[in-house]
From Swiss-Prot:
It comes from the Eukaryota. The modification Pyrrolidone carboxylic acid is found at Q1. Optimum pH is 8.0. Alkaline pH values decrease the thermostability of this inhibitor. This is Trypsin inhibitor 2.
């Protein structure tokens, strides 16, 4: 299971989650867009 660190891009819809308790900040929820780990 690979995870993204702070500052990296994330996309829960593609299974790209942030590491640990880092949140995936997305500009909007729909349509799904890549976010940034913060």
């Amino acid at each position: 299971q690979q995870c993204a660190e702070r500052g990296q891009s994330c996309n829960p819809y593609e299974g790209i989650e942030c590491c640990g308790d880092i949140l995936c900040i997305q500009p909007r929820i729909w349509p799904p867009v890549p976010g940034r780990c913060a």
